[in-house]
Structures are given as structure tokens and as C-alpha cells.
Amino acid sequence: MSGGAISIFGELNAHTYLGKAFFSSINYKIHQWPECRRRLGRRLMGPAQAAGPGKSSVDERNPNAAAATEINTNASIPLLQRECESFDEIQDRLTMMQDQLSRLTATLDNKQNLVDRVDQIGDKQSSMPTPPSTGHVVSDVDGQIQRYHGPWTLLAQCRQLESDLASWSKADHAAEVASLVTSMVQETMRVPSSSLSSFHTEIPGMGMCLPPRQLLSVMVECFLKNADYATSIFDHQSLYCAIDRVYRDPSNPEEKPWVLCFNLIILLTLGAEHSLQSEDPFVRPMLQAVQTAAGNSRLLMEPRLVSVQALALFSLFMQQCYPDNEPLGDGIFAQACVLARQMGLPQPHGYAATPSTLTAAEVDERHRVYQSLYIRNRYATTTSGALMWLPNSIMCTGTASAVGAHWELAKLQDEIHRVLGSCSFGSSDRRIKVAQLREKLRVWQEACLVAETQPMSMDRVILCLLFLGTRIYISMDNKETDTESFLDDCRLSCLLLIVSCTKHLRPDFSNQFHHLLRRLNPSRRNSDGSAHSSPSSTPSSSSTSSPLPSPASERPPPLDVVTRPSTGTSTPSSPTLLPLPRLANAFPITAIFILARHILGISAEGKPINTHRTVTEINSDILLLESLLFCFQNNPPFLGGKDQTLHCSYKLGQVLDHLVRIVHTMTSDRTSPRAHASGLPLVTEHAEMTDYMSRMFMTSKGSPASDLTGLWYPRDVTSDTPMELSIPDFQSVWPTPQDSLASSTNPLATAEGSIYTPALHPTPIIPNTPLDLSELFGFTNSDASEVWNLGTETTDLLENRRPSLKRQRTHFESQ
């Protein structure tokens, strides 16, 4: 029991003791009241009545005695009045004590409800299938470095699964499962000692240098055009002015944060299309500049707006380069938030202490920076349990149209965290608050998720993933983990990643994907009719009598309400895949653990679930997790190198690898994708596909589940990837707009428009590996390093070869 409840009990007992003593005195006075009344009566009646009838009460011969009797009678009247007033005071005190006892009782009831929720005793709200609310503190081998992992982080989820599986007592596989779980937890706790220096060789004599101005001009145009909630942190005119100022005086040490920003803009823009190679002669100098900036504490500690912007881009770059080392990017992001608070960016309208010194453009840019940091912080808290570094947004008004939907969702997530993380609400108040939050989330969904984005855009997929992650977060807190809609949110989250990052898709996954999208949109679900609204039409359903979703030829474009009109005849073309690093940061990590528990038939605390599950549903979910694992393994990293290991570079992918192996071990005797040999059906339409998929994902107990490259695929069935099935008349789930077919370049992922938006004509065609732009700027590989030398001769040479920023921008506008 908490200390507050104990103090309330003590106060109540004290008041009870005092009340008993007071009531005892009242009872004594009540018992004494008849005797007092008799004494008063005798004094009022006088000596005559006291002597008996027939006797005179006043001695006529003694006038002094008569006067004394009158005095005694007059003196008795105030005494009677005082006695009556004392009883009125007693009644008032009784009323006051009754009110105090009522308040104490109500306070005690509220404290008892709080104790029940915290201690998980007797209250339904207490049995939450979540990790311990205190989280985990992990130390390194020497105990010098300690890191806190909150209750929704990846490590906490692994620890919770370890606790849930501890009660699983299957004798033939218990030891193997325990070993796999321990390995998963240890892998999650391990923090690699990766740094920028481990991915490239340092160039002697080259520090933090400016990139070629012509390259920067091209990349800045693409960067600003494709800016999203994470990169929309610059005022365009201010950025162009900074470029002119820095290149006029490149040796000014005060402009070093801008030099870091320029290099990061190029790296992030190039990495949005292709995996960067650390050995590339053009990428190496930019990585060298970033590494030099990382060692300059003064550069990243000064409370300047450009320092916050540089840290914001730096953290985004590190999170994509090193997805297996979360503290590396999270620490840089935390420093950006600390500087933002020191500068007063969370204040209304971005003002500082003296708002008159800021222009309208500066106010807008400060607000952009704060919005971007705030959105990223709330998104990370919802999807992966990151710490909150920025205060809430109650005092902030207005938002840029480019990030309006993200801004509103982030504010809604902030409200959700405050409500679900508060202990001041009772059970009934909490349910009312949660219902109100669900309604607000539904309103946001109808306003922002349906009609305001284009098919296959990076921004749209991220919005959908974050919306699903928010709904999963609310359902997890309210113990709604067995409902079909909750499981469908987890399945759709996995399918969004698979569809966005995989060339081809299994037809049953494609049907399930479109059906879940239709159910996600209430207006579309109602318009499609009751025939398609049944949850049994998904491959994971327990019933097969309901009709399947409409065929591929009749489906609307995914994540879009209205089909855009065609501008011409189309030709077959593979859809452009989205980069996994950005999508992985928006993926709700809880989804894979929920599906794994559903497959294994356990809930939190290791208890069996009551939901009816079919073999078809279990097999479908297993294949879904395996397909997601292959998606993590098959996608190239954001930054690669010749010495890079072949294992999955994503921490979530490594955990998913262990999770799939645990599922295989625990379901080997019941059902799994390799159980077709025992006659159990799989979720495929033909026997040939059943045999293929069972061999595709089957792993021996002696080899890790992540080693999918070593599986025995028949060469007459497989193609480039295990999921590239040769299916006639199979239509890709993502439509290819006509405007993408005429472009000769691979476009960058757009934030507001389609991924297929053609790139600018001056944008160079970036080869896969290595990245070589020497022909574009008129020099060979041998003298490529001279580009980054800011000496007088080299600078003059480059100025003769590249146009000025003003002429370059005029050239873009003419295009």
C-alpha cells in the first residue's frame, strides 16, 4: 500500500478516535440533562413550592427574603439560555465532523483505487499486458555506462516476452526456447561500438571542408522540394543566403555549423535513392566532415538556431546509418532538443525573451525547427518508447501546411501519453478519457489519412504506420489485445513495410493488404457494402464462407480514395520501392511481439488466450513475420562498406530473427510453414506454391532463421528474391502513374506528392555503386580529392567550372 493511503488511514483513525471521545461527552451531557432540568425547575418555583402545598412561598414578614428569591430567579434564566446554546454548538460540531468524515472517506476511496491500479490488486485496469512501469536500467560490462530503457522500448518488450515464456513448460523444447530467449535479450542489450571512423578511411589533411557548390546547388533544390516533417527545418531564403555567405568566406569558423548542414543535406538527399558506399571518393569527404563535426563539442553546444538544425539533421543521418546503435542517434537528437529549450523554441510563436528582435522569417524558421523536433520526439515515444525531451505543445499555435497532418497527430499522441500515463484518473474517468481520445483519433483519420496524400508516397506510408501504432498503443494500455481489429492493426503494419520495400508480393498477402486497408477507412468500408465488411474475408480469418476482397483489377490505388485519371497508355513497369531506413523508424515495434504471442497462444503473464485460432490463421501470421524478416535482411543499409558484415543491420530485424526462431521451435509439433509434410494446410492457393513456400522459409534447428540465403530454393521456381513468385496475370499492389515512365532518372521519395514525381533535369543519374560524379563536374577520379581542398588555387579553379548560385537557380527555373 502506498504512503499516501497509509497517511489517509492514520488521519481517519485519529478523527475517529476524537469523534468517539466527543460523542462520549455528548452522551454524558444528555444523561445529565434531566437532573439539570429538575434543578432549574426547583430554582424557578421558589421556596413556597419547594416547601409543599398550602405554604406561602414568600414570607410576608421578611421582605428581604422575597427580594433574594427574585434575584435567584432572574439569575437562572441566563443559565438556561447558556445550556441551550451549548446544545446548539454541539449540533454544529456534529455537522462539521460529519462533513469531515465524508471527505476523508471519499479521499480514502480514491487513494484505494490508485493503490489497486498501481499494485494490480482487484482492479481490471491493473492487469495490463505491458512491461513493468519502471523500465530497465542496463549497464555495460564495467558498469560505467548505464542506459535507461522505458516500458515500451525494444529491450522492455523482449524482457516481457521472456517473462511470459517462463511459464511455458513444454519439456522437449523448454531448454531450447529458454536459450533462444536469452540470446534475444542479450542481443538487444548489446550496443555496438560503431562510429563514423569504422566505415571509412580518414583522408590525411582533410578536415571539415565545403562540398562543391554546384553539387550543393543541385542537392539543395531536391532537398527542399522533398522536405518532410523531419527535414522541413529551413527557411528557403535564409538557406540560400547562408550558402552565398559561407562560400564567400569559407574560412570563417563561425560558419562551421552551416558546413555540417551542407554536407548532411547532400548525404541525406543521395541516400534517399541509393545506398551510400563509404569507400566512394565523393562520399568519403562528406563523411569526413561529419566525423570532424562530431568531435567538435563547441560546434554542437552553442545555443544557435543553425546548431539545432545541424544536430537535427545529424541525428536523422545517424539513425539511418546505424539502426543497430540507437543511443548514437538518440543522444544527438536529445542534445538538439536541449538546445531548442535553451533557446526558447517551445515558447508561443517561437519567440524568445525579446520578440521585437526577430523578423517574421526568423520566427517562422524557429517554429519549423521546433515542430520538426516535437513531431519526431512524439513519434519515437509512441513507436519505440523513447524519452520525451520537449514539453507539450499547448502554447504553440499554427503550423506549416507541409507537416499539418503530422503536427496534429503528434499533439494527439502527446495527449494520449498524458492521459494513459497519469494516475489521477479513476477507472470510470479513465474509460471516458480513452473513449474521447479514440474519437479524436477517428476524426484525425477521416481528415488527414484518407484524402490528403498520394499513392505510394513516403509521407503517406509513414502516416499510416504511425496511426496504426497510436491505435495499438491505446489498445495495449486498455488490455484489448485479443480483438480482431487490434490484431489486424498489427498485421497491416507489417504488410505496409513488406509492400513498400518488396518487389513482388504473395497474392494472399496482396488480398489481405487491400482488405485491411478497406477496413481501415470507414467511409470506404461502408460504400463497399456488407459483402466486403466481414472480417472473415482475410486470410487470417477463422471462416471461409465470406467472399474475398475484390480482384486486383477492380481495386483502387492503395492508400488513396479517388483514382487519379490516366494521362495515356501504360506499359508494364516495376514500382519504385521506398527506402527501409525511414519506414523502420515509424514501425510500431510492439506489433511483432503481439503477433508472436497470438501465434503461440499466450497473453501477457504467460496465460493462454481465449481467442479461437485456426491453423490457416497461424500459418498466415508466421509467414507474415518471416516475410517481414526477409524484408529487413534483403534491403541494403543506408551506409555500406566493403568490411560490412552480412547480418541484418537493423536492431529490430535482429530481434525479429530470434522471434521467428522461437516461433518455429514452439510450433514445430503443432503447426508451422514447414508442417505441410504432416498434412496441415498452408495459406496458398495451389499445391505447388504450398511446397515452394514451405521450403522457402524452412530452416533447420541448427542454423539461424536469419540465414535465408542458404536455404535450398529450386532454381526453376525462385528468381532474384525468395518472394519473387512467377504468377501470370499478377498485378502489383502499387500502381505506376504514367508520369514516371518517361523519366530517365530514379526520383527521390517525395513528402507531399507521389514517389513517382520526376526528378529535376539537372539531378545527376546516381549509379548503384560506387557513386562517381566526376564526369558531371569535369574532372577524373584521380583529382577528385582536390574538390574538397579549399585552397586559393583550387577554389579559383572550381569557380571557373561551376556557375554562381544565382545563375544556377535561374537555370532551374528555366527548366
UniProtKB/Swiss-Prot annotation:
Keywords of this entry: Nucleus, Transcription, Transcription regulation
Record's compositionally biased regions (Pro residues): 548-559
Compositional bias ranges of the Low complexity kind: 523-547, 563-577
GO cellular component: nucleus
GO terms for MF: DNA-binding transcription factor activity
Superkingdom field: Eukaryota
Coiled coil: none
Locations listed in the record: Nucleus
Disordered: region residues: 522-577
Functional note: Putative transcription factor that may be involved in the regulation of the expression of the gene cluster that mediates the biosynthesis of phenalenones such as herqueinone, compounds that have been reported to treat tumors, bacterial infections and/or mycoses, and rheumatic diseases.
Protein name per the record: Putative transcription factor phnE
Source organism (scientific name): Penicillium herquei
